[in-house]
Amino acid sequence: MPLRRIVISGCSGGGKSTLSLAVAVQCQKQGGNVGFVDCEQALSKELALNMGVDPNKFVVYQPRDGEDAIDMVETMLKSRAFDLVIVDSIAAMTPRAEIDADIEQQHMGLHARLMSKFMRRVYSLVSEANVVLLCLNQVRVNLQSYG
């Protein structure tokens, strides 16, 4: 696998998380350690074990919000303890301001700004740490573009 940044996009339920676990197993078979940032809070530990993931070489972190996820990815990369870091998923990296806000408040562009911050803080570390960053993302339909 090339050592850099990979994004896998697809529809919900399309097998992206399962594919990432298969990649994790292959990384571990080559002696690697895997960090899994579970932004969706949906990782099936049973599925991971059934697929052959070694829990001794597999660290799972479930962030509270998008900023927490970025901090954890950055920490994992700086530690140089991981050969593969998986982010599941970019779409689930909810900005802290959106979580903390009243339901009526509109927060246009927060996710885009968070992703820009993610790129600035994390992408340069990938090359320095000699690690694969595998990000999963969901394809969404923009209903406002029709009609």
Regions flagged by a language model, labelled:
Residues 7, 84-88, 134-135:
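Structural motif
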Residues 10-11, 39-40, 89-90, 137-139:
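Fold-independent oxyanion-binding glycine-rich loops
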Residues 15, 68, 143-146:
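A broad, structure-centric signal for solvent-exposed, well-ordered loop/edge residues
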Residues 4-10, 102-109, 145:
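Short hinge/gating elements
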Residues 76, 108-147:
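Phosphate-binding/switch region of NTP-binding enzymes
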Residues 22, 30-121:
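Conserved inter-motif catalytic segment of the P-loop NTP-binding fold
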Residues 1-31:
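Glycine-rich P-loop/Walker A and Walker A-like loops and their local beta1-loop-alpha1 context
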